């Protein structure tokens, strides 16, 4: 009994381990002969090759059902939303005009970075001159793709006082900040203008949710109706997708707040006006509109 329970010495365990790794008598490596290792390796090669083939075939079949230029399902994008620039961590434009540019320089830098692609030299290289007031239709012919599709020019000069050309601080230094509004891109979407407002553009209007008198006067660039509404020309629609229209230029409406009351949190709501865009849905506050906070601290 004592012999059965006797512990193996370290040298015995090392010998057993060496014999397991390579047994010269049976010519086995880790308990298997060379032919056994070859068979098991062949099995796994065939097994994983089969799995790879099945996965590749499934992926290929799925890709045949997908249009690489247009998403198959886009029902949730029927009503595009709006976004603001400068783009910061939150939808807030809060700064001070006390002469120190540390509170507003980040907004200026953000707008400079955004609008550098809207310089005339860049736009003339990437886009073409389109006919204002009409859709920029570039239809395909059957299975023949009309690609790459051309993009219309959008020069930063049309943003007027908010272009960063005449006023390099976009009004932030003087307490008259500019905010750029853009509409989210939806492939093949054709907004229908409201003819009472404009025949050639969809319009954007910004108001205060709390008190319009405190928000003061607003200028829009580009605009219609004597600058009472911002305007996005129909020639920037439709958008055909990044793959088909790689140089597409996103149009903006610049909103300049001329005399907003300082030291007040202004809840600003901007809506896009088009016959086929719903901007009144109480369940989705960002459908056809955008809401942001603006505050200009007192001197």
Swiss-Prot record:
Function, as annotated: This is the non-catalytic component of the active enzyme, which catalyzes the hydrolysis of ATP coupled with the exchange of Na(+) and K(+) ions across the plasma membrane. The exact function of this glycoprotein is not known. Some specific sequence of the beta subunit can modulate the activation of the Na,K-pump by extracellular potassium ions.
* Compartments reported by the entry: Cell membrane
The protein's name in its UniProt record: Sodium/potassium-transporting ATPase subunit beta-2
Query: Topologically, how does it sit relative to the membrane?
Result: Single-pass type II membrane protein
Q: Cite the GO molecular-function annotations of the record.
A: ATPase activator activity
The GO annotation for biological process reads:
intracellular potassium ion homeostasis; intracellular sodium ion homeostasis; potassium ion import across plasma membrane; sodium ion export across plasma membrane
**PROSITE patterns per the UniProt record, alphabetical:** ATPASE_NA_K_BETA_1, ATPASE_NA_K_BETA_2
**Xref: InterPro entries:** Na/K_ATPase_sub_beta (IPR000402), Na/K_ATPase_sub_beta_sf (IPR038702)
Spell out the Pfam families in the cross-references.
Answer: Na_K-ATPase
Where does the sequence pass through the membrane? 37-57
Topological domain (Cytoplasmic) residues are: 1-36
Task: Give GO cellular component annotations, separated by semicolons.
Answer: sodium:potassium-exchanging ATPase complex
Q: Cystine bridges: which residues?
A: 130-152, 162-178, 206-270
Summed up, the tissue specificity of this protein is: Expressed at a high level in bladder epithelial cells and eye and at a trace level in kidney; it is not detectable in significant amounts in the stomach, colon and small intestine.
Q: Which family does it belong to?
A: Belongs to the X(+)/potassium ATPases subunit beta family.
The subunit field of the Swiss-Prot or TrEMBL record says: The sodium/potassium-transporting ATPase is composed of a catalytic alpha subunit, an auxiliary non-catalytic beta subunit and an additional regulatory subunit.
